Regions:
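Single conserved hydrophobic/aromatic residue that forms the stacking wall/gate
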Residues: 1-13
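Flexible "stalk/tail and boundary" regions
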Residues: 10, 14-74, 83-141
């Protein structure tokens, strides 16, 4: 193995992570432990400020479907919990794995293709939004 691949594989075997629903409950997220903890703390802080039944219900489902203290198997693979996979991906066997900001997203390929088509359809608006952000950044400098 190339040294970089070997290091990444060793890192995966050593590191622990959380397998949970993604925020929209349409796919699976693989969070580094610290990212997951910050996410939960954020929602807990919001709920302490003002109790909200919807947020409490969301967090109850989110936490009950989260698998903490996960690690790669001896071959460096991530094994998705069967119940979570079934609930989030249904019977789909083909999945796409994508980096999504601070976590990995595992989604059914068929759903991902629909999202990709929507993304492509809105690409001009996305570029315009990026241009606007860059213009705002130039003004700060």
């Amino acid at each position: 193995l190339h040294p970089r691949v070997r290091r990444q594989r060793q890192m995966c075997i050593r590191d622990r992570f959380v397998i949970a629903p993604e925020f929209d409950f349409k796919s699976i997220a693989i969070y580094p432990e610290m990212v997951f903890m910050r996410l939960c703390e954020h929602y807990e802080r919001l709920n302490r400020k003002k109790k909200n039944a919807q947020l409490m219900n969301y967090m109850q489902w989110f936490n009950s479907m989260s698998y903490t203290d996960q690690e790669c198997d001896a071959q460096g693979r991530v094994l998705l919990p069967a119940k979570l996979r079934s609930m989030m991906l249904g019977e789909e066997k083909d999945v796409d794995i994508m980096g999504n900001d601070d976590h990995l997203r595992v989604a059914a390929t068929i759903n991902n293709m629909a999202n990709f088509e929507l993304f492509k359809d809105n690409l001009n608006a996305t570029w315009a939004a990026i241009d606007e952000l860059e213009d705002g950044e130039d003004e700060k400098e």
